[in-house]
């Protein structure tokens, strides 16, 4: 079993299930590669509700089915007051942390020892964990 941990951002999860999105094929391929190579895939508990909200705008019943699939392939990371406070502290101390949700995801990825954050948000800031879009990940994987 590969012990490498990858944090999967909510936009990647939405991209997997919404075929109309521009990064759909890259997101599906990236997750397939990661699963085939036995990476541990993680996401945060708050992203599950965000993903459901976005997908339910298209089809509520399918959105629930999609979430069931997500919880079967990704480890869902809970968080509490300490993680929220750490995210706020980072935002107050580093102007590069501009988005509370992204900063919280970074805090969780760091806490869990993730080596990579997979996000299709090109402005996702992480000072010490590599961030790749799914397209970048697929391109890099194919060159290895």
Swiss-Prot record:
Signal peptide: none
Cofactors required: Mg(2+)
Binding positions (Mg(2+)): 9, 102
GO molecular function: magnesium ion binding; RNA nuclease activity
Keyword NADP: no
Pfam family, one: PIN
Domain of life: Bacteria
EC number assigned by the record: 3.1.-.-
UniProt keywords, alphabetically: Hydrolase, Magnesium, Metal-binding, Nuclease, Plasmid, Toxin-antitoxin system
UniProt keyword annotation of Endoplasmic reticulum present: no
InterPro entries: PIN-like_dom_sf, PIN_dom, VapC_family
Domain PINc: 6-132
First-tier enzyme category under EC: hydrolase
Record function comment: Toxic component of a type II toxin-antitoxin (TA) system. An RNase.
HAMAP family: VapC_Nob1 (MF_00265)
Record family assignment: Belongs to the PINc/VapC protein family.
Protein name per Swiss-Prot or TrEMBL: Ribonuclease VapC1
Source organism of the structure: Aquifex aeolicus (strain VF5)
């Amino acid at each position: 079993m590969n012990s490498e941990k990858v944090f999967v951002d909510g936009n990647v999860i939405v991209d997997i299930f919404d075929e109309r999105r521009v990064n759909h094929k890259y997101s599906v391929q990236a997750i397939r590669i990661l699963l085939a190579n036995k990476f541990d895939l993680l996401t945060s508990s708050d992203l599950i509700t965000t993903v459901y909200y976005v997908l339910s705008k298209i089809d509520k019943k399918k959105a629930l089915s999609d979430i069931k699939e997500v919880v079967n392939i990704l480890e869902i990371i809970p968080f509490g007051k300490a993680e929220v406070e750490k995210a706020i502290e980072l935002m107050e101390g580093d102007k590069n942390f501009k988005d509370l949700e992204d900063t919280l995801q970074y805090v969780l990825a760091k806490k869990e020892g993730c080596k990579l954050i997979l996000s299709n948000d090109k402005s996702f800031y992480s000072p010490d964990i590599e961030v790749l879009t799914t397209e970048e990940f697929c391109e890099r994987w194919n060159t290895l």
